[in-house]
Amino acid sequence: MDLFKILLLVFFVNISFCFAADPYSFYNFEVSYITASPLGVPQQVIAINGKFPGPTINVTTNENLVVNVRNKLDEGLLLHWNGIQQRRVSWQDGVLGTNCPIPPKWNWTYEFQVKDQIGSFFYFPSLHFQRASGGFGSFVVNPRAIIPVPFSTPDGDITVTIGDWYIRNHTALRKALDDGKDLGMPDGVLINGKGPYRYNDTLVADGIDFETITVHPGKTYRLRVSNVGISTSLNFRIQGHNLVLAESEGSYTVQQNYTSLDIHVGQSYSFLVTMDQNASSDYYIVASARVVNETIWRRVTGVGILKYTNSKGKAKGQLPPGPQDEFDKTFSMNQARSIRWNVSASGARPNPQGSFKYGSINVTDVYVLRNMPPVTISGKRRTTLNGISFKNPSTPIRLADKLKVKDVYKLDFPKRPLTGPAKVATSIINGTYRGFMEVVLQNNDTKMQSYHMSGYAFFVVGMDYGEWTENSRGTYNKWDGIARSTIQVYPGAWSAILISLDNPGAWNLRTENLDSWYLGQETYVRVVNPDENNKTEFGHPDNVLYCGALSKLQKPQKVSSSASKSIGFTSLSMVVMALVMMMMLQH
């Protein structure tokens, strides 16, 4: 058999494998510093492939995603995929409890499947307060063509990132926190990495580049909006246009009209917006600070422009007002309660979302997690959950388990707040595999908090002001509470979530408020199948990085501007296909 026939045989074996399996998408990310002026002042920001914000990742349910990351920063790097569940592969989650940092000048390749998910998400760098300097971007998971969607196909799909922003870079902000200081009021709010349109000559400096979204009259667009900021809740609105809420973090919602919606740190929403206004002028897109003294924070407002293709003039006049609820603290909470799961719509699978009857499942574990204002522990300013300020392990949790490294963490996280003095510890929750956990998030701080759980979409069953008690369960929504991965907890209030622990691994449970997270307001939930023949969790990847107690296992990497040497079998298949095509042309 000649070489051509051998290659042809290999080609057909490989092509059969590829088409039988789920397809792959490939991205190369070069993460570096660039100089930009989002608020009119030159500053160092973190870019991906020279872009700020980074490129949008766009994939389809069940695709395998390969992201090769080259770290050109001067410090360690991890990318976290906010809301992507990483089914059975917490090794790819990109936080310190699951991954060793990618050293400067090194390449590392993430490879994971977006299994059984659809929706709107984002990614960001999770170490060293880096998100405050950028490195974030949108992450879109489209449904498969065979799965029905509960609305007509939009005429366009637009991603929007919003977030508070400081002119100081992440290293200066980090030092302020290390020195025990507050960060103070942000310098502004960015929309897609750009500063505000000059709607007011006093509040907005001249010469700032602003975001413009161009649309066609009469068309309907899907706007995917993510709050990628540091700690500020933002009210999102478009002058003169209704926002039809359609999806949030992978769950289709009951479709309702809003003139504006509060989007808290770490949250993502999809809106259907119809361009049904006249084109006498452009329209303002606004993201303004919430749950603060909004008179003082007036300058902390992001303003972009919605421009019809036949627009006759620039936007002018006052911004459209946000909610007038200065003396009504229930308005925002009632709006949040109005967001409900569309139980009849298909999600990533053909069956209706509501076929999972979460309200009838027996709870196996209950955790009441309380955060307080920052405290001083051993002379350092820290934040806590249940009186514990988390210290990240030097060795990732599941890697320590697999390679039998002891004393990395303790499975002793308390189910209720500690009564003694606060302490620093690597204390994590021992989750029961296939258990059903109730978590009550009690915010006894004066600031809004957002909480995120990696690895899962949890069910938001209740929220209210005051202290949670067992009687509060009588108010739970056990039918159509939204399933999502990030939930807000209002100051002096609680939010309750239910989690089906069907995804083995070690999963980060944290505040999304970057300052509080940096100071220790997090833990992990370790979920392990006790069966000795455990086949539910994939082993660590071949390219795993080693650190901490396992540092001696790490081989040096040859510094190169090229991609990783290997990104799996699919790359080999592609090479073989290319060789075969060349041989075919010669024959």
Swiss-Prot record:
Propeptide: 563-587
Source superkingdom: Eukaryota
Binding, Cu cation: 80, 452
Residues carrying covalently attached carbohydrate according to the record: 14, 58, 107, 169, 200, 257, 278, 293, 342, 362, 430, 444, 534
Pfam families: Cu-oxidase, Cu-oxidase_2, Cu-oxidase_3
Signal peptide as annotated in the record: 1-20
Function (record text): May be a monocopper oxidase of unknown specificity. Involved in directional growth processes, possibly by participating in cell wall expansion.
Keywords linked to the UniProt accession: Cell membrane, Cell wall, Copper, Glycoprotein, GPI-anchor, Lipoprotein, Membrane, Metal-binding, Secreted, Signal
Any GO BP: cell tip growth
Similarity comment: Belongs to the multicopper oxidase family.
Cell compartment(s), UniProt: Secreted, Cell wall; Cell membrane
GPI-anchor amidated serine lipid modification positions: 562
Tissue: Expressed in roots, hypocotyls, cotyledons, leaves, stems and flowers.
Lineage, top ranks: Eukaryota, Viridiplantae, Streptophyta, Embryophyta, Tracheophyta
CDD domains: CuRO_1_AAO_like_1 (cd13846)
Species in which this protein is naturally found: Arabidopsis thaliana
Family matches, as InterPro entries: Cu-oxidase-like_N, Cu-oxidase_2nd, Cu-oxidase_C, Cu-oxidase_fam, Cupredoxin, CuRO_1_AAO-like
Cofactor(s), by name: Cu cation
Recorded GO MF terms: copper ion binding; oxidoreductase activity
Cellular component aspect of the GO annotation: apoplast; cytosol; plant-type cell wall; plant-type vacuole; plasma membrane; plasmodesma; side of membrane
Protein's name in the database: Monocopper oxidase-like protein SKU5
Topology of the protein relative to the lipid bilayer: Lipid-anchor; GPI-anchor
